[in-house]
Amino acid sequence: MNKVAKRKIYFLGIGGIGMSALARYFHKKGCVVLGYDKTESPLTRKLEDEGILIHYEDNPNLLSDDIDLVIMTPAIPKDSLQLQWFKDNKIRITKRAEVLGELSRLTKSVAVAGTHGKTTVTAIVTHLLNYSGKRMSAFIGGIAKNINSNVIVGDENDEVMVMEADEFDRSFLHLSPYISIVTSIDADHLDIYGDEQELVKSFNEFVAKTSENGVVIYNHKLPVTTDRKHLTYGFEDADVMARNLRIENALTKFSLVTKEGLGLGEFEMRLYGKHNVMNAMAAIMACFQLKIDMKDIREGLATFKGVQRRFDIRYKDDEVCYIDDYAHHPEEIKASLSAVREIFPTKELTLVFQPHLFTRTRDFMDEFADALSQADKLILMEIYPAREKPISGITSSVLLDKISCKQKQICQKDELLDVIQSSRPELLVTMGAGDIDRFVPSIEMLLQS
């Protein structure tokens, strides 16, 4: 994979956050990059602006036989006409995860896994290494605000490569990291794994991929087992622990101490919530293992701007604050809303939530109801299906009936702006992993007016 210049690479499902990062990587490496996605989006438009040709029609007549390699996302359906054409013409087809696996073996790599928190940790590690001057490449599962991108493309002199490790369809088992990080293991993707026990087993298989001279870093509460060198982090009973957590001057501040009582100093950041202190700890420990000076780590963390759609404060004035967040699992919702309450304890919280996947809504119906009941007002959108077909009896209306907050309603997409306007929110949060992000600019404009 390190000798790729001038190859012609086609991406099936180029508009996904992970696929677009790979597309940008190979494009900047000098490859001819083009691809297909089902729908146009702000991200695909940016790729086109960068010189990448994208088709929005599953039409084999748009393809040419000089394509050297096809990289596909697991979201592409098996009956895709373009996929079948590539198979018929015996053009090499590989999965995104397999390509990342090859790249992870080019140099020392840091792989960040977890059902929640992995994008933020990946982005923090990337920023801290970049700030310290390390020669590096990075693949992030979101748009990091410091670089306004989801990728950093280095060169053959890279000292380290950082990548987000996706547990969906066991993709992360293709990686060979020097440092592996596990942030969380909560039941999710049960349509793939069947039960939580299988999910835990898969995470431990990922950890086992860590090189023999490498290190495993993980949340001390997790059921991780490894014979590699390992370090844990948390608020208690861990190798590294956070102390004196507080918010001062709109910054989160905390100190770190080892289990032996050694103080590692004070840190501050623009992120909020205990979950983000945990995320910062994982990133700090990884960078320290890579011999980054603690002064650079401390300064870098203070300048980290966050990731788009991760507790993303989009608008704030004297009357209203608007936060957009990617949370789509009950535990993520709880953590995010807890952070919101911590910062704005007296404001009435209006939550707009778009459930993501019928299977996830089915598997965690009661947990979603409990988490969403934290809102004062709830505007619940219809379930975003993504790759799935509807499941009988699994609807937003069924979920709404289980939610205990007094003011709650179902809202269709074409009603959303009017409903928000009529609710006159003082603290508005939008959440979800579907297409709710497409409403964010319009909501910003509405609140500004």
Language model regions located:
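Nucleotide phosphate-binding/pyrophosphate-handling subdomain across enzymes
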Residues: 2-10, 18, 22-29, 250, ...
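Beta-strand->loop->alpha-helix junctions that form or flank phosphate-binding loops
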Residues: 36-37, 55-58, 94-98, 139-141, ...
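Conserved N-terminal Rossmann-fold NAD(P)-binding element of oxidoreductases
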Residues: 9-14, 431
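C-terminal helical cap/extension that packs against the catalytic core
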Residues: 369-426
